Amino acid sequence: AHHAPAARRVVHQRLVYAVLGEAVAAPGLADVDLLRARRPEACMCTAVVRKDAFWGAIGPMDEHIPGGYAEDYDWMLRAARHQPIAVHPEPLLRVGWDVQSHFRDQWPAWEAALSQVLDRNPEFASEPRGRARVEGQVAVAIAAQGRRSEALEHIRATLGWSWREPRAYLALLIAAGVPAERIGAALNQRGKGL
């Protein structure tokens, strides 16, 4: 079968200052809350961090996260424990984004990696919206694997953190039999993801 080339889009990222022990004086920088929302402008590939902090308190990216999924988010959360993460308000870097994600439809890796992110970051307990977001992603991954009763447990947990979390309702649709791939494709068309 002939496959069309993967669609590519350019996404503007913002420069992140993750400096341990001292603030970077730059006009217009704004702190971001990485527990509440996974902010695309706060990306490890654009982080500026002192070498001693990278190899010391923060540490390098964890290569053992299941499937390598969310390893950048895990790193940014670790960095944020040591210093607020600030982003520059204007795009300073172009990053190519391949719409055909390496992680697309790798539900067991999603589930394991995101569960590990929750386990490693007890701070999520103080941020219900953020906890619901990640719990909802886990619920989607479980539902997509066809584990309906377990998905329903995770959907209930997600809604317990925040009834406004859309991934809980998406996981419910998937558990009811709507293919996750179809929902994911529809969201991707709108620039969103599961």
Model-based region annotation:
Residues 91, 95-98, 103-129, 148-161:
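Catalytic core of nucleotide-sugar-dependent glycosyltransferases
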Residues 3-4, 52, 189:
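N-terminal cationic leader/targeting segments used for protein routing and processing
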Residues 12, 16-108:
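Conserved nucleotide-sugar donor-binding catalytic segment
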Residues 66, 129-130:
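Short helix-capping and inter-helix turn/linker motifs at the boundaries of alpha-helical repeat units
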Residues 1-14:
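A short, conserved acidic/glycine-rich loop-to-beta-strand motif
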Residues 123, 143, 147-194:
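Membrane-interface aromatic/basic loop that binds lipid-linked glycans or pyrophosphate carriers
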